[in-house]
């Protein structure tokens, strides 16, 4: 019976040990957290001061990585100015015992802070502590904290029990975890800030992409309409004058007409005949048509695809249409070049006018009849010939 009692005796005596260990660890955890809070407050204050120094009041909400980047640029600019002044000083042979070059200034600055960093920091904090620096870290409290840290080091050196060693390991692991968590928080903040900047840039690019997608859709539907009504032949779809005419049509259309036309084409894209009906319907409701409330995205994007997908689909459709037409009419390539040749400027100009007049007859554009279309860049020779003809008359 004595044996079980003796076996239970050590466990009874060792029961208070975990409680004592917790009591010893509690002040350390509190001091460590207080030190971390002071460190974070110091970093926040430094970033705030840097932000105010390198940014104006309108950009006071800049992110940390932007502040660091701007600070780096600011320091480089200050170094360049200082270097110029020191070179000017050296040109006058001024010997005042101070550095005469930028390298000497850097060396003296590094030597001053490496030798007297603690003295300078204490004097700086006692004389004029900044507003962002915690008041607990200045004066007697800072000294008490240093003494407490020294006592902790002595106690840790004297501890030899296994329980204390385990507590130290847990404490170190806890500190490492807190440092890792702090670093992860900083990385997450930087990633979020970068995502916000990217979203701003993408929001500025989206309208241009949508406008380009709308024009591709209009180009494809217009080309189908012209070929269906025999306004242009199959080998004329690749002529620059045709593209110039379609571009002129797109520029003359108002936003309401663009949205309405693309909406009707999207609803009635099953047959080529519906394209003509779309233009006629647009001409019929032109007088009473108001804002349809359809923006560029709603006018040309389906519910099943994203705007980017629709954009690339239309681009591939136009490219495949042009490639197919070119492959089918390789035998007529000489005739196509003859049409594009500057020897027939009247035919090119007539084709341009024919396309514009066809859409005027459908009521899709309201360009005045006496207004000459904007000539493409490759028709300068034709205009010069026209002017010479008028001079001869």
Curated annotation (Swiss-Prot):
Tissues expressed in: Expressed exclusively in premeiotic germ cells in both sexes. In females, is expressed in the embryonic ovary. In males, is expressed in pubertal and adult testes, in premeiotic spermatogenic cells. Expressed by some type A and B spermatogonia, preleptotene spermatocytes, and early leptotene spermatocytes (at protein level). Expression begins in late undifferentiated spermatogonia and persists during differentiating spermatogonia (at protein level).
Short motif Nuclear export signal (NES), span: 209-218
InterPro entries: bHLH_STRA8, Stra8
Disruption phenotype: Female and male mice are infertile due to severe gametogenesis impairment. In female mutant embryos, the initial mitotic development of germ cells is normal, but they fail to undergo promeiotic DNA replication and meiotic chromosome condensation. In male mutants, the premeiotic DNA replication is conserved and germ cells are able to partly condense chromosomes and initiate meiotic recombination. However, they fail to regularily continue over the leptotene stage of prophase I.
Keywords assigned: Coiled coil, Cytoplasm, Differentiation, DNA replication, Meiosis, Nucleus, Oogenesis, Phosphoprotein, Spermatogenesis, Transcription, Transcription regulation
Biased composition (Acidic residues): 141-192
Protein's cellular compartments: Cytoplasm; Nucleus
Location of the region described as Disordered in the Swiss-Prot/TrEMBL record: 1-25, 124-201
Any GO BP annotation: male germ-line stem cell asymmetric division
Polar residues bias spans: 1-11
Keyword Transmembrane helix on entry: no
Residue ranges that the Swiss-Prot or TrEMBL entry lists as coiled coil: 66-95
Upregulating conditions: Up-regulated by retinoic acid in embryonic ovaries and adult testes, and by all-trans and 9-cis retinoic acid in P19 embryonic carcinoma (EC) cells. Transcription is repressed by DMRT1 in undifferentiated spermatogonia.
One Pfam family matching this protein: bHLH_STRA8
A GO CC term attached to the entry: nucleus
Entry PTM: Phosphorylated in P19 EC cells.
Motif (Nuclear localization signal (NLS)): 28-33
Function per UniProt: Meiosis-inducer required for the transition into meiosis for both female and male germ cells. In female germ cells, acts downstream of ZGLP1 as a key effector of the meiotic program: required for premeiotic DNA replication and subsequent events in meiotic prophase. During spermatogenesis, next to its role in meiotic initiation, promotes (but is not required for) spermatogonial differentiation. In complex with MEIOSIN, directly activates the transcription of a subset of critical meiotic genes playing a central role in cell-cycle switching from mitosis to meiosis.
Complex formation: Interacts with XPO1. Interacts with MEIOSIN.
Protein name, UniProt field: Stimulated by retinoic acid gene 8 protein
Organism: Mus musculus (Mouse)
Lineage: Eukaryota, Metazoa, Chordata, Craniata, Vertebrata
Gene: Stra8
